[in-house]
Structure formats: C-alpha cells, structure tokens
Amino acid sequence: MRGCLQTVRWLTSAWQRPPSYPPLSRAAPCRFFNVSIPRNAQSRKPVSDLERRIAAIPIDRFRNFCIVAHVDHGKSTLSDRLLELTGTIQPGGNKQVLDKLDVERERGITVKAQTCTMLYNYRGEDYLLHLVDTPGHVDFRAEVSRSYASCGGALLLVDASQGVQAQTVANFYLAFAEGLKLVPVINKVDLPSADPVRALDQMANTFELDPKTAVLVSAKTGLNVEQLLPTVVEQIPAPVGDHTKPLRMLLVDSWYSTYKGVILLVRIFDGEVRAGDHVGSLATGLKYHVGEVGIMYPGQTAQSVLRAGQVGYIYFNPAMKRSQEAKVGDTYTKVGSEKLIEPLPGFEEPKSMVFVAAYPVDASDFPHLEDSINQLLLNDRSITLQKESSEALGAGFRLGFLGTLHCSVFEDRLRQEHGASIIITPPTVPFKVIWKDGKEEIITNPALFPEEDALRAKVVELQEPFVLATLTFPEEYLGRVIELCESNRGEQKSLEFFTATQVILKYELPLAQLVDDFFGKLKGSTKGYASLDYEESGWRRSSIAKLQLLVNKVPVDAVSRVVHSSQVQKLGRVWVSKFKEHVDRQMFEVVIQAAVGRNIVARETIKPFRKDVLQKLHAADVTRRRKLLEKQKEGRKKLKAVGNVVIEHKAFQAFLAK
C-alpha cells in the first residue's frame, strides 16, 4: 500500500512540473512540427552506385537499340541472354524476363513492347545500353513503330532454320524508313536444321545487308552472344541531344498502376527531368508535378534525374488518373518553356480493322465484364469500345481490334486475368457506304448495315477494305498458295524467288477474307512453312450484302454478317444446318432461314413434338380420325402464331464458337 502511495505522489509531482525542452537555435529547423513532404524528396535520397555510374557516362556512350524479327524467331530469349551478360539479371533459369503478361508466356509471343536499361563495360569505359524487345506479329505493328522512335539502331534477327519470313521483310522496311542502323543477327545456329549460309544469302539478296557484319548466335545456349554487345557499341550510333537545352520529352508508351496512376515511358531528346519538376503536355495543355523518375533495370528503379538521350519512366504526384490524358506521341516540356521548343513528330494512331461483339454468358455478369474490359483498356488504347444491346444476348460491347491475334489475346486476358465468361461473335471488318447525298459512312456493326430497300433507294456504292498481303513459303507449295489466294478473291501483284527454293508472293486480298481464318488455311496448304504479313491497301467497290438468320421469320440480331454476294449461298446453308443442331424442339414447328433482304437462301425445319391423338380411336373410325388430325393441325398453327421460340444462351454460345 505504501509503495502505491509513493508512486501516485511521484506521478502527481511530475505532472505538475513544467516540461523542459532543449534550447532551440533560431537557425535550426524545427524537428517537431515539420510534417510536409517536399515534392522533390526523391532527389534527397542517398545516391546509389548504379546512379553514380550512370551520371558519369556522357551521351556519346549511350546506345538505344531494339530487336526486331518475325514472330517466334527468338527475340525474348536473346533479350534474356543480353540482360545476363550485362549483370542486369542473375544468370540461370531466366525465361522471357521481359514478357510480363501471362498470355505472352503461355503463347510464347511478345504482345507488348518492353524496355530495359543495361550497363556494359567495354574497353574500360561504361556504356549505357537501352534495349527494347518488340512484338513480331503484324497485329502489333504499332508497338514496333513506336519503339523505333526511342532507338538509334536495331538487331535484325533471323531464324537460321526458317530464314527470312514475311514479317522480317515488313519490320526491315519499317526500321529502314526510320533511318535505323541495322545489325544482322542469325539465331538458332545450334539447331540440326539450321542453315546459316542460306539465311545470310537471303539477308544479302533481300535487304542488301553485308553478310560480313552479321553475328551468328544461339540465344538458347548463349553461343556467341557475347559478341553482340561490342557490335552494338561499335555499329549503332549514339543518340543526339543536349541536356542544357529546355526539356523535350516524347511519350512513347504508358501503362496503368493501381497505386501510382498512369506511368509514362518517355524518351528525353533535350534537357533533363527530375522529381518535383512542373511539366506540361503540348497536346492537351494539362500540367503535372513529377512524382518520380527512373529507369527499367529490369523493374522500375528510381533515379534522381533523366538526361537527354535516356529512355525511362515517370509518374506524377498527384497521379494522372485518366489514361486518355496520356496521348502516345505527345511532347512534354517544363512549364514556362512551351514557346521555346517545337513539338516532336508524333505517331500515327492505329486504326481498328477487326470488330467483334462481346456478351456475358450470364446477363447479371454485365457489370463485372464492363469493369474487366475497362481495366484492360487502361493498358491498350488501340482497342475501341462501344456499348450495344441484343434482344437475343442482352447488353454487351462492340470491340475494335488491330487484327485477329490482337482480338484473341484480349479474349484470353479477359478469361485468365479477370475470370470473365463471355460469348464472342465471329470477327467482322468495317464497310463503307456512299449515300446519294454524297455522305460517306463507315459501318462496323452488321446490324446497322442498310436494308435492301434503303440500298436500292439511297445508296450509290458499297466498298470494302483490301490489304496487300506478303507471303513467303517454299517454292514447292506455290500452286496451292496461288489457288488459295484466288479462291479468296485475291489479285496477284508480284512473284519473286529470293533464293532457289524460297518465294515471296504478294496478293491484294479483301480484309474480310483475311480475318476468316486465312492464315490457318495458308498454314494447312504449306504444312506450316508459310508466313504472312499485310498492310492496308485502301477501299474498293464491292458487291456485298447483309446475311441474316431468321427463326420463324423473326431476325436474330446477334447473328448477322455482311458478306460478299458470292458467299451468300454457301454461308447461308452452313448457318441454318449448324443453328439447327443447337435449338431444342418446341411444341410447334420451328423454321430456321438464312436470308438477304426478302430473298431466302437456305432453310431448315425442326419438327414439333407430336402427341398421338389417335391412340384411343377404333381403327375403322375414319371420319373421327380425320377430324382429330385437322384439330391438332389447327392447334399447332395457332401455337406457332402466338408462341415464342425459346433459344437458350448455350445455343448461341455453341453456334458462335469456332
């Protein structure tokens, strides 16, 4: 008890005494109440060894380069080996480090261009290398062309066993047009089927590249890869820029982070940018405070400054919340310098060429589907989005893509990353309608295509898009490929042999035929040895019509398609027979028809369930028999007139599936 009283007295006296603090100097900052965090707090962090090394490297020892090639020629694997050689990642067990999406790793393709900065010591001096791993497929050509803006050269990669392919040719001309220094590289020389001499001859004949400058490597085993980095240093030019001039910063790409908002991948042409700088967009006029700058090494690694010639990332504080504000190709500068600089040439906006409709399998999942699509759109603004509604399938979306692979990858990401259960309609292409009053209209939704009466009365001309397709394949399959192209309404433009056994064939084809599994048919005709690339070739007048599916004379709005008149009969018969398989029998007759306007081109009938009304009759009662059968017939007519055909969602899902 006595101890408790002593404790209480001590606490009471301590509470009554005035607090004593150490004297504060007037010059000393107050430690107790300074809770504000300056915007440039990042610049006060201790400087790392990495940052010291980068700061000591002048711009003439910067090298910005990318790897371009046909799909599946080993770009991502070669990137892994280069990152290991420069010590950016630890060797062993690395597989496509720069392919960050699940769908990229699953399919073994690059969808999104990825970047990484490397430090390389060559002859006693540090070099700052910036690598871009680009997609190889034609659908992601926009990613490739944007990557070239941040590069001074490119490694042109060719598979030693396959040789020059269609997209090798296309990527070469893209890089050549940008003025990039090209270094030929032959990959996969370790394969038993490798023929590097043939590949070198093809590169010399097709691109006029000197075979003596080529480097022969195996990215998988690492054979000879160490020779690539000295070649990059010696052959690829340094970027041009001046860090003392006003800031000129090109937005190359962007992606969305839940915590940091929109993150920008930028190339600094002049000047420098730090955390805390106040910058503005020349395209939108919006202004932002820089929250952090850094490089990809290989993940996001913060730095105190990005200088002229560097490629890195920045994000803002407060964050940029709307990805629409980040216009790829935009120029940024410091606030107050807007009139001192000229905007950098931007990029051509990619146009959607393939359209599909997407509906949730369960109508109640529409909000979840909308949420999932919007999240994916934050990182891929080349997709167009428009809400639409179908009587058969309910609320959904009309989505526009750069190509069929682009569409397929998006669908896979919806299913894998967001668990979406969706119904996707077959891909369609846009069509142009020229009206009699001179107006032109692009139709992307078959349901909005003019009906037959309007076509006759108000339309002057219908046009469809064509593409110039470049096909490369062994000479032995030439006859089959020409036959395939001709059957798909193609027109031959050129034919050349770039080796004794390899052919480059160019055809103008309707885009509608190309998206209708043309590549699959091409692979089948050539046992998988053909490759395909294409570019837009403009619009052409065409005889096209809207094919509709009718169930008991009522159009099914979810199933309509604009096709060439030569395909109407064949496709109509396929439709009605396939749809019949998935529609359940009703109490009345169901008639399935394919029609163009009022013209019925194909028909199938689903017989009704039949009740035996004669079961209790005497065999000789002919009059009564006839009377009951007539009554049943009249009842079915009435039921057919007032009854609705019930078509389950799974029927549409099965019908629309490939």
UniProtKB/Swiss-Prot annotation:
Membrane-traversing stretches: none
Catalytic activity, as annotated: GTP + H2O = GDP + phosphate + H(+)
Membrane topology: Peripheral membrane protein
Residues annotated as binding GTP: 69-76, 133-137, 187-190
UniProt entry keywords in alphabetical sequence: GTP-binding, Hydrolase, Membrane, Mitochondrion, Mitochondrion inner membrane, Nucleotide-binding, Protein biosynthesis, Transit peptide
Annotated GO MF terms: GTP binding; GTPase activity; mitochondrial ribosome binding
Superkingdom, natural source: Eukaryota
This protein's record includes keyword Ribosomal protein: no
Residue intervals of the tr-type G domain: 60-240
GO cellular component, one term: mitochondrial matrix
Subcellular location: Mitochondrion inner membrane
The protein's enzyme class: hydrolase
Transit peptide: 1-40
InterPro entries: EF-4, EFG_III/V, EFG_V-like, G_TR_CS, LepA_C_sf, LepA_CTD, LepA_IV, P-loop_NTPase
Its EC number(s): 3.6.5.-
Residues in the signal sequence: none
Family according to the record: Belongs to the TRAFAC class translation factor GTPase superfamily. Classic translation factor GTPase family. LepA subfamily.
PANTHER family named among the record's database cross-references: TRANSLATION FACTOR GUF1, MITOCHONDRIAL, TRANSLATION FACTOR GUF1-RELATED
Function noted in UniProt: Promotes mitochondrial protein synthesis. May act as a fidelity factor of the translation reaction, by catalyzing a one-codon backward translocation of tRNAs on improperly translocated ribosomes. Binds to mitochondrial ribosomes in a GTP-dependent manner.
Name of the protein: Translation factor GUF1, mitochondrial
Native source organism of the sequence: Paracoccidioides brasiliensis (strain Pb03)
UniProt lineage: Eukaryota, Fungi, Dikarya, Ascomycota, Pezizomycotina
Gene that encodes it: GUF1
